[in-house]
Amino acid sequence: MSRRCELSGKAVMSGNNVSHANRKTRRRFLPNLCQVTLISDALGRQFSLRVSAHALRSVEHNGGLDPFLLKASDAQLSSRALKLKRAIEKVQAVAA
């Protein structure tokens, strides 16, 4: 399982620890990932996703999983999230 957010694409970054003597050693910056269960109103189901805390705040800010996915670009979504987005678009197209 990769350390990558399924909704925002946020992943591991690398950098340096810098000591007081200005010595540099390599380190990794890990994203703050949480295993959460989000509910899709359009599909009427729950989905378990591994998302960053930042993406979780964005989902809440946008009014839920469905509006967030519809607004998000396809490039930053994981394959599972992209399938969810397509399913939500299909349900909304039938309802309209």
Curated annotation (Swiss-Prot):
Pfam families: Ribosomal_L28
One of the record's GO molecular function terms: structural constituent of ribosome
SUPFAM superfamilies reported for this sequence: L28p-like (SSF143800)
GO cellular component, one term: cytosolic large ribosomal subunit
Keywords: Ribonucleoprotein, Ribosomal protein
Single biological process term from Gene Ontology: translation
Top-rank taxon: Bacteria
HAMAP family in the record: Ribosomal_bL28
Similarity-based family: Belongs to the bacterial ribosomal protein bL28 family.
Official protein name in the record: Large ribosomal subunit protein bL28
Gene: rpmB
